[in-house]
Amino acid sequence: MPALDHPLIDQFLDALWLEKGLSDNTRVSYRSDLALFNGWLQEHSVSLPDAGRDLILDHLAWRLDQGYKPRSTARFLSGLRGFFRYLLREKLVAIDPTLQVDMPQLGKPLPKSLSEADVEALLQAPDLGEAIGQRDRAMLEVLYACGLRVTELVSLTLDQVNLRQGVLRVMGKGSKERLVPMGEEAVVWLERYQRDGRAELLNGRPSDVLFPSQRGEQMTRQTFWHRIKHHARVAGIDKPLSPHTLRHAFATHLLNHGADLRVVQMLLGHSDLSTTQIYTHVAKARLQQLHAQHHPRG
């Protein structure tokens, strides 16, 4: 893609040099980043000062697809933020769209994820002869099918579930509501649990909690974590786990099977695409491993 200069880029860099004594290397890097972004915007018929948050996020996704490193993208965002602060100060724009874009977190460890075989073993671990086992199987199926946060899962109530349409109405961070499809397997196990195991678990006690504890109350995060570790031991999984292991597996497996990053972002309830992007590194690493193992020239 051709990089396109813009007079505002030169004005910004001149102002930055006068104010902060910008080094030649930083000046060249900022110019290159902003010119590349301007060229990308031109292909989308948008002028540089008119770039909004959504377009900036789209460009970040494009950079990721092109193989740009997180440190390079962090430098680009740093320059872009300075550029829009300059435009705002000069009254050339009304708002700074970069305020709503998070910086990439450098050096952040990749989320722990399980293989699809590990997930299958974990899902089959609960004892279905017991009500608590039926609850746990349905709970794990829903968690893996929907990629919920643990707090979202344990706080689910009956009125948030639509089995006929196969969707959950989830209340996420910041009281933001989203609809998440469950898939056929999760619906089947949830129907079975609600028909049999849940009533036995409650033993006549009233509750609108979808996955109640043995006392009929909302399950705590600690109890959920205890159940996950128990089932992992039963399944023979000795990999490091976290309460969000199945959420990470949900995102990674979707991307491994070709899901669009934006779709995964919406399903996870991430407000910013950069939060979702870290999963693409996990997915790409797995794909590279498979290529090396199975391709004749790997």
From Swiss-Prot:
Keywords: Cell cycle, Cell division, Chromosome partition, Cytoplasm, DNA integration, DNA recombination, DNA-binding. Pfam families: Phage_int_SAM_1, Phage_integrase. SUPFAM superfamilies: DNA breaking-rejoining enzymes. It comes from the Bacteria. It is found in: Cytoplasm. CDD domains: INT_XerDC_C. InterPro entries: CB, DNA_brk_join_enz, Integrase-like_cat_sf, Integrase_catalytic, Integrase_recombinase_N, Integrase_SAM-like_N, Recomb_XerD, Tyrosine_recombinase_XerC/XerD. Gene3D superfamilies: 1.10.150.130, Intergrase catalytic core (1.10.443.10). The active site is at R149, K173, H244, R247, H270, Y279 (o-(3'-phospho-dna)-tyrosine intermediate). GO terms for molecular function: DNA binding; tyrosine-based site-specific recombinase activity. Residues 109-292 form the Tyr recombinase domain. One of its GO terms (biological process) is cell division. Residues 3-88 form the Core-binding (CB) domain. One of its GO terms (cellular component) is cytoplasm. Site-specific tyrosine recombinase, which acts by catalyzing the cutting and rejoining of the recombining DNA molecules. The XerC-XerD complex is essential to convert dimers of the bacterial chromosome into monomers to permit their segregation at cell division. It also contributes to the segregational stability of plasmids. PANTHER family: PHAGE INTEGRASE-RELATED, TYROSINE RECOMBINASE XERD. Belongs to the 'phage' integrase family. XerD subfamily. Forms a cyclic heterotetrameric complex composed of two molecules of XerC and two molecules of XerD. HAMAP family: Recomb_XerC_XerD (MF_01808), Recomb_XerD (MF_01807). This is Tyrosine recombinase XerD. It comes from Pseudomonas putida (strain ATCC 47054 / DSM 6125 / CFBP 8728 / NCIMB 11950 / KT2440).
